Amino acid sequence: MSAKVGVLLSGGVDSAVALYLLIEKGYEVTAYHMKTVRDELYITKQIKHKVCCSPSDTHDAQLIAKKFGVPFKIIHVEDVFKEKIIDYFISENLAGKTPNPCFFCNDYIKFGFVMDVALSDGMDFVASGHYARILNGKLYRALDKEKDQSYFLASIKKEKLSKILLPNGEYSKETIRDIAERAGIHVAKKIDSQDLCFLPDNDFKSFFEERGVKIEPGNIITSEGKIIGKHEGLPFYTIGQRKLGVAAGQKLYVKAKNVEGNFIVVSPLDEVYQNEMRVKNLNIYVDLPDEFLATVKIRKKFKEVPCRVEYLKDELKVQFLEPVFAVTPGQIAVFYNEDEVLCSGVIE
Protein backbone atom coordinates (compact mmCIF):
# COMPACT_ATOMS: atom_id res chain seq x y z
CA MET A 1 0.00 0.00 0.00
CA SER A 2 1.31 3.45 -0.95
CA ALA A 3 2.16 5.94 1.79
CA LYS A 4 -0.30 8.82 2.11
CA VAL A 5 1.01 12.37 1.84
CA GLY A 6 -0.77 15.62 2.56
CA VAL A 7 0.73 18.31 0.31
CA LEU A 8 0.50 21.94 1.41
CA LEU A 9 -0.73 23.29 -1.93
CA SER A 10 -0.56 27.09 -2.06
CA GLY A 11 -1.45 27.54 -5.72
CA GLY A 12 2.10 28.47 -6.69
CA VAL A 13 4.57 26.63 -8.88
CA ASP A 14 6.72 25.25 -6.05
CA SER A 15 3.99 23.38 -4.18
CA ALA A 16 2.41 22.29 -7.48
CA VAL A 17 5.64 20.62 -8.58
CA ALA A 18 6.14 19.10 -5.13
CA LEU A 19 2.70 17.50 -5.49
CA TYR A 20 3.54 16.27 -9.00
CA LEU A 21 6.90 14.80 -7.95
CA LEU A 22 5.30 12.88 -5.09
CA ILE A 23 2.61 11.47 -7.37
CA GLU A 24 5.35 10.38 -9.78
CA LYS A 25 7.08 8.58 -6.90
CA GLY A 26 3.92 6.61 -6.18
CA TYR A 27 2.58 8.37 -3.10
CA GLU A 28 -1.15 8.67 -2.47
CA VAL A 29 -1.58 12.44 -2.34
CA THR A 30 -4.19 14.75 -0.82
CA ALA A 31 -3.89 18.52 -1.32
CA TYR A 32 -4.37 20.86 1.65
CA HIS A 33 -4.86 24.56 0.94
CA MET A 34 -4.92 26.99 3.85
CA LYS A 35 -6.73 30.31 4.19
CA THR A 36 -4.89 32.62 6.58
CA VAL A 37 -7.06 35.74 6.25
CA ARG A 38 -10.56 36.47 4.97
CA ASP A 39 -10.88 36.85 1.21
CA GLU A 40 -12.35 40.33 1.76
CA LEU A 41 -8.86 41.65 2.50
CA TYR A 42 -7.80 40.98 -1.09
CA ILE A 43 -11.09 42.08 -2.62
CA THR A 44 -11.26 45.48 -0.88
CA LYS A 45 -7.65 46.51 -1.51
CA GLN A 46 -5.77 47.50 -4.65
CA ILE A 47 -2.82 45.15 -4.18
CA LYS A 48 0.28 45.87 -6.25
CA HIS A 49 2.48 42.93 -5.27
CA LYS A 50 1.85 39.19 -5.28
CA VAL A 51 0.91 37.75 -1.89
CA CYS A 52 0.05 34.19 -0.87
CA CYS A 53 -3.30 32.75 0.20
CA SER A 54 -5.41 35.07 -1.99
CA PRO A 55 -8.65 34.00 -3.76
CA SER A 56 -6.73 33.63 -7.03
CA ASP A 57 -4.29 31.28 -5.27
CA THR A 58 -7.21 29.18 -4.05
CA HIS A 59 -8.53 28.96 -7.60
CA ASP A 60 -5.10 27.95 -8.93
CA ALA A 61 -4.72 25.33 -6.21
CA GLN A 62 -8.12 23.85 -7.08
CA LEU A 63 -7.14 23.63 -10.76
CA ILE A 64 -3.84 21.92 -9.91
CA ALA A 65 -5.56 19.35 -7.69
CA LYS A 66 -8.19 18.73 -10.37
CA LYS A 67 -5.53 18.28 -13.07
CA PHE A 68 -3.82 15.52 -11.10
CA GLY A 69 -7.04 14.01 -9.76
CA VAL A 70 -6.19 14.35 -6.07
CA PRO A 71 -8.56 15.21 -3.20
CA PHE A 72 -8.54 18.91 -2.31
CA LYS A 73 -9.23 20.32 1.14
CA ILE A 74 -9.42 23.96 2.19
CA ILE A 75 -8.29 24.48 5.78
CA HIS A 76 -9.49 27.69 7.42
CA VAL A 77 -6.81 28.84 9.83
CA GLU A 78 -7.92 32.48 10.14
CA ASP A 79 -8.54 32.36 13.89
CA VAL A 80 -5.37 30.55 14.95
CA PHE A 81 -3.40 32.63 12.42
CA LYS A 82 -4.67 35.83 14.03
CA GLU A 83 -3.82 34.58 17.51
CA LYS A 84 -0.39 33.14 16.77
CA ILE A 85 0.87 35.32 13.93
CA ILE A 86 -0.97 38.64 13.54
CA ASP A 87 -1.31 39.39 17.27
CA TYR A 88 2.34 38.42 17.77
CA PHE A 89 3.34 40.70 14.89
CA ILE A 90 1.50 43.63 16.48
CA SER A 91 2.83 43.07 20.01
CA GLU A 92 6.43 42.71 18.82
CA ASN A 93 6.21 45.91 16.80
CA LEU A 94 4.78 47.78 19.77
CA ALA A 95 7.68 46.45 21.85
CA GLY A 96 10.12 48.10 19.43
CA LYS A 97 11.16 44.89 17.71
CA THR A 98 11.14 43.75 14.07
CA PRO A 99 9.38 40.36 14.00
CA ASN A 100 9.51 37.60 11.40
CA PRO A 101 5.95 36.22 11.12
CA CYS A 102 6.74 33.81 8.25
CA PHE A 103 9.21 31.96 10.49
CA PHE A 104 6.55 31.28 13.11
CA CYS A 105 3.84 30.57 10.54
CA ASN A 106 5.81 27.52 9.47
CA ASP A 107 5.89 26.22 13.05
CA TYR A 108 2.42 27.15 14.32
CA ILE A 109 0.34 27.04 11.14
CA LYS A 110 1.75 25.09 8.17
CA PHE A 111 3.64 22.44 10.12
CA GLY A 112 1.49 22.92 13.20
CA PHE A 113 -2.26 23.34 12.77
CA VAL A 114 -2.50 22.15 9.14
CA MET A 115 -0.05 19.30 9.67
CA ASP A 116 -2.08 18.11 12.66
CA VAL A 117 -5.23 18.10 10.51
CA ALA A 118 -3.49 16.10 7.77
CA LEU A 119 -2.07 13.53 10.17
CA SER A 120 -5.44 13.14 11.89
CA ASP A 121 -6.91 12.52 8.42
CA GLY A 122 -4.62 9.50 8.14
CA MET A 123 -1.72 11.02 6.22
CA ASP A 124 1.65 9.37 6.83
CA PHE A 125 3.59 12.48 5.84
CA VAL A 126 3.11 16.16 5.12
CA ALA A 127 4.96 17.79 2.22
CA SER A 128 5.51 21.30 0.91
CA GLY A 129 7.27 23.10 -1.92
CA HIS A 130 9.91 24.67 0.31
CA TYR A 131 13.53 24.65 -0.80
CA ALA A 132 15.34 22.75 1.95
CA ARG A 133 16.28 19.14 2.69
CA ILE A 134 15.54 16.73 5.50
CA LEU A 135 18.02 13.86 5.73
CA ASN A 136 17.95 11.27 8.52
CA GLY A 137 15.76 13.49 10.65
CA LYS A 138 18.03 16.52 10.26
CA LEU A 139 17.37 19.83 8.49
CA TYR A 140 19.73 20.98 5.73
CA ARG A 141 19.93 23.74 3.17
CA ALA A 142 18.55 23.14 -0.31
CA LEU A 143 20.98 22.32 -3.10
CA ASP A 144 19.93 25.62 -4.71
CA LYS A 145 21.58 28.01 -2.25
CA GLU A 146 19.96 31.07 -3.86
CA LYS A 147 16.45 29.75 -3.18
CA ASP A 148 17.22 27.95 0.08
CA GLN A 149 14.45 28.36 2.68
CA SER A 150 15.96 26.44 5.59
CA TYR A 151 16.18 29.78 7.42
CA PHE A 152 12.37 29.99 7.52
CA LEU A 153 11.89 26.30 8.31
CA ALA A 154 14.21 26.38 11.32
CA SER A 155 11.20 27.04 13.57
CA ILE A 156 9.83 23.52 13.01
CA LYS A 157 10.32 21.23 15.99
CA LYS A 158 12.90 18.47 15.59
CA GLU A 159 10.45 15.66 16.32
CA LYS A 160 8.28 16.67 13.35
CA LEU A 161 11.02 16.39 10.72
CA SER A 162 10.58 12.63 10.27
CA LYS A 163 7.01 13.27 9.08
CA ILE A 164 7.90 16.00 6.55
CA LEU A 165 8.87 15.60 2.87
CA LEU A 166 10.55 18.40 0.89
CA PRO A 167 10.93 17.09 -2.67
CA ASN A 168 12.03 20.45 -4.14
CA GLY A 169 15.16 20.62 -2.01
CA GLU A 170 17.10 18.59 -4.54
CA TYR A 171 16.33 20.93 -7.46
CA SER A 172 17.02 24.47 -8.61
CA LYS A 173 14.16 26.91 -9.08
CA GLU A 174 14.83 26.90 -12.81
CA THR A 175 14.50 23.12 -12.90
CA ILE A 176 11.26 23.28 -10.90
CA ARG A 177 9.78 25.67 -13.47
CA ASP A 178 10.98 23.38 -16.29
CA ILE A 179 9.31 20.39 -14.63
CA ALA A 180 6.10 22.42 -14.30
CA GLU A 181 6.20 23.32 -18.00
CA ARG A 182 6.74 19.70 -19.05
CA ALA A 183 3.97 18.49 -16.74
CA GLY A 184 1.55 21.05 -18.17
CA ILE A 185 1.05 22.84 -14.85
CA HIS A 186 -0.64 26.15 -15.62
CA VAL A 187 1.23 28.14 -12.92
CA ALA A 188 4.67 27.26 -14.32
CA LYS A 189 5.51 30.94 -14.86
CA LYS A 190 3.57 32.37 -11.91
CA ILE A 191 5.59 34.94 -9.96
CA ASP A 192 6.59 34.26 -6.37
CA SER A 193 4.81 35.90 -3.44
CA GLN A 194 6.59 39.05 -2.27
CA ASP A 195 4.76 40.43 0.77
CA LEU A 196 3.20 39.18 3.98
CA CYS A 197 -0.21 37.63 3.29
CA PHE A 198 -1.88 39.84 5.92
CA LEU A 199 0.08 42.99 5.02
CA PRO A 200 -0.24 43.55 1.26
CA ASP A 201 2.25 46.03 -0.20
CA ASN A 202 3.78 46.41 3.28
CA ASP A 203 1.16 49.05 4.11
CA PHE A 204 1.97 49.27 7.82
CA LYS A 205 0.00 52.45 8.45
CA SER A 206 -3.29 51.07 7.16
CA PHE A 207 -2.66 47.77 8.95
CA PHE A 208 -2.42 49.40 12.37
CA GLU A 209 -5.18 51.94 11.71
CA GLU A 210 -7.67 49.25 10.66
CA ARG A 211 -7.03 47.41 13.92
CA GLY A 212 -7.38 50.49 16.10
CA VAL A 213 -3.73 50.41 17.13
CA LYS A 214 -2.58 53.96 17.81
CA ILE A 215 0.97 54.67 16.70
CA GLU A 216 2.49 57.81 18.17
CA PRO A 217 5.13 59.99 16.47
CA GLY A 218 8.27 60.90 18.39
CA ASN A 219 11.76 62.32 18.19
CA ILE A 220 14.74 61.21 16.15
CA ILE A 221 17.91 61.83 18.12
CA THR A 222 21.62 61.34 17.53
CA SER A 223 23.86 59.19 19.72
CA GLU A 224 24.84 62.42 21.48
CA GLY A 225 21.21 63.17 22.35
CA LYS A 226 20.55 65.93 19.82
CA ILE A 227 17.02 66.04 18.37
CA ILE A 228 17.23 66.25 14.57
CA GLY A 229 13.70 65.43 13.48
CA LYS A 230 10.46 63.53 14.04
CA HIS A 231 9.57 59.92 13.32
CA GLU A 232 6.07 58.77 12.36
CA GLY A 233 5.97 55.81 14.77
CA LEU A 234 8.46 53.19 15.93
CA PRO A 235 6.92 50.25 13.98
CA PHE A 236 7.63 52.04 10.69
CA TYR A 237 11.41 51.86 11.22
CA THR A 238 13.94 49.09 11.68
CA ILE A 239 17.57 48.86 12.74
CA GLY A 240 19.91 49.84 9.90
CA GLN A 241 17.29 51.87 8.02
CA ARG A 242 18.69 54.94 6.25
CA LYS A 243 15.76 56.79 4.66
CA LEU A 244 14.51 58.80 7.62
CA GLY A 245 13.15 61.98 6.03
CA VAL A 246 15.55 64.27 7.90
CA ALA A 247 18.33 66.48 6.59
CA ALA A 248 21.32 65.85 8.82
CA GLY A 249 24.23 66.73 6.55
CA GLN A 250 25.53 63.17 6.67
CA LYS A 251 24.25 59.63 6.17
CA LEU A 252 22.59 58.42 9.35
CA TYR A 253 21.11 55.02 10.14
CA VAL A 254 18.71 53.74 12.77
CA LYS A 255 20.85 52.38 15.60
CA ALA A 256 18.19 51.72 18.25
CA LYS A 257 14.51 52.20 19.10
CA ASN A 258 13.50 53.29 22.61
CA VAL A 259 9.93 52.28 23.45
CA GLU A 260 9.74 53.99 26.85
CA GLY A 261 10.82 57.35 25.47
CA ASN A 262 9.29 56.75 22.01
CA PHE A 263 12.41 57.93 20.23
CA ILE A 264 14.76 56.60 17.57
CA VAL A 265 18.54 56.82 17.92
CA VAL A 266 20.47 57.39 14.70
CA SER A 267 24.20 57.27 14.05
CA PRO A 268 26.81 57.05 11.29
CA LEU A 269 27.23 53.69 9.56
CA ASP A 270 30.16 52.44 11.61
CA GLU A 271 28.18 52.70 14.86
CA VAL A 272 25.46 50.33 13.59
CA TYR A 273 27.87 47.38 13.51
CA GLN A 274 27.98 44.96 16.46
CA ASN A 275 30.39 42.32 17.66
CA GLU A 276 27.95 40.26 19.71
CA MET A 277 24.31 39.41 20.38
CA ARG A 278 22.10 37.24 22.56
CA VAL A 279 19.53 34.81 21.19
CA LYS A 280 16.56 33.33 23.10
CA ASN A 281 13.44 31.21 22.38
CA LEU A 282 15.71 28.49 21.07
CA ASN A 283 14.76 25.65 18.73
CA ILE A 284 17.56 23.10 18.83
CA TYR A 285 18.20 20.25 16.36
CA VAL A 286 21.46 18.78 17.63
CA ASP A 287 23.16 18.22 20.97
CA LEU A 288 24.92 21.54 21.49
CA PRO A 289 28.21 21.68 23.41
CA ASP A 290 28.76 24.49 25.92
CA GLU A 291 30.80 26.34 23.29
CA PHE A 292 30.98 25.86 19.52
CA LEU A 293 31.83 27.54 16.24
CA ALA A 294 29.18 28.04 13.55
CA THR A 295 28.00 30.40 10.87
CA VAL A 296 24.90 32.47 11.54
CA LYS A 297 22.26 34.09 9.35
CA ILE A 298 20.39 36.95 11.06
CA ARG A 299 17.82 37.82 8.38
CA LYS A 300 16.56 36.55 5.05
CA LYS A 301 18.87 38.51 2.76
CA PHE A 302 22.06 38.36 4.77
CA LYS A 303 25.49 36.96 4.14
CA GLU A 304 26.25 34.50 6.91
CA VAL A 305 29.14 35.25 9.20
CA PRO A 306 31.28 32.95 11.34
CA CYS A 307 30.72 33.17 15.06
CA ARG A 308 31.68 31.70 18.41
CA VAL A 309 28.68 30.60 20.44
CA GLU A 310 28.29 30.03 24.17
CA TYR A 311 25.30 27.80 24.98
CA LEU A 312 23.74 28.94 28.26
CA LYS A 313 20.86 26.41 28.21
CA ASP A 314 18.02 28.90 27.67
CA GLU A 315 19.93 31.36 25.50
CA LEU A 316 22.95 31.73 23.26
CA LYS A 317 25.68 34.31 23.71
CA VAL A 318 27.11 34.95 20.26
CA GLN A 319 30.45 36.56 19.45
CA PHE A 320 30.84 37.46 15.77
CA LEU A 321 34.26 36.82 14.22
CA GLU A 322 33.71 39.95 12.14
CA PRO A 323 31.51 43.01 12.84
CA VAL A 324 27.89 42.61 11.72
CA PHE A 325 25.60 45.38 10.44
CA ALA A 326 22.15 46.02 11.92
CA VAL A 327 21.64 43.20 14.40
CA THR A 328 17.89 43.58 14.90
CA PRO A 329 15.91 42.55 18.01
CA GLY A 330 12.95 40.35 17.09
CA GLN A 331 14.57 38.96 13.97
CA ILE A 332 15.61 35.32 13.68
CA ALA A 333 19.12 33.92 13.99
CA VAL A 334 19.76 30.53 12.40
CA PHE A 335 23.02 28.70 13.04
CA TYR A 336 24.65 26.32 10.56
CA ASN A 337 27.47 23.82 10.39
CA GLU A 338 28.12 23.92 6.65
CA ASP A 339 24.68 22.92 5.24
CA GLU A 340 23.19 21.49 8.43
CA VAL A 341 20.91 23.61 10.62
CA LEU A 342 22.06 23.42 14.24
CA CYS A 343 19.53 25.65 15.97
CA SER A 344 17.59 28.89 15.74
CA GLY A 345 16.21 31.58 18.02
CA VAL A 346 15.01 35.15 18.39
CA ILE A 347 17.54 37.98 18.64
CA GLU A 348 17.29 39.94 21.89
UniProtKB/Swiss-Prot annotation:
Coiled coil: none annotated. Signal peptide: none annotated. The record marks H130, Q331 as: Interaction with tRNA. Its EC number is 2.8.1.13. Residues 147-149 are annotated as: Interaction with tRNA. The keyword S-adenosyl-L-methionine does not apply. ATP binds at L8, L9, S10, G11, G12, V13, D14, S15, M34, G129. It comes from the Bacteria. One of its GO terms (molecular function) is ATP binding. This is tRNA-specific 2-thiouridylase MnmA. It comes from Fervidobacterium nodosum (strain ATCC 35602 / DSM 5306 / Rt17-B1). The lineage of its organism: Bacteria, Thermotogati, Thermotogota, Thermotogae, Thermotogales. The gene is mnmA.
